[in-house]
Amino acid sequence: MKFEYKRPDDLKLEAYGKTYEIPPKTAYLIDEVNKITERISAAGSSASDQMMAVRDGIALFIGEEEAERIFPRDTLLTAANSDEMTAFWFCLNECSNRETEAVMAKYAPKRKEDIRVSSNPKK
């Protein structure tokens, strides 16, 4: 038996005049996304705190420099479109989730009904 793992190429997302490579989730990225989600929830009705958390979440995926280029901190609360920021945050998460699901689909155990044993190919 031989196991070979080949990580799929990162999904490429075109946005804001650039192409970003979105990786599958790592333990670090999952932990950080969870922290951002907790910050958003903890912000309650404070839209400014929610937007700061969303912006930090975007930076997790595309880097601080790019997040600053698109959503500068100094104008975040006065000029940024909260719907646009939230949509981009969801899009980045969805892209990363798709990458992770592709890896899982390739390597995860199959349902018992889907397993074919060579000595009995009908089962």
List PLM regions with ranges:
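Short, isolated positions in well-ordered beta-strands
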Residues: 20-22
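Short, surface-exposed, charged amphipathic helix/loop patches that serve as local interaction elements
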Residues: 27-123
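Short acidic, Pro/Gly- and aromatic-enriched capping/linker segments at domain boundaries
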Residues: 1-11
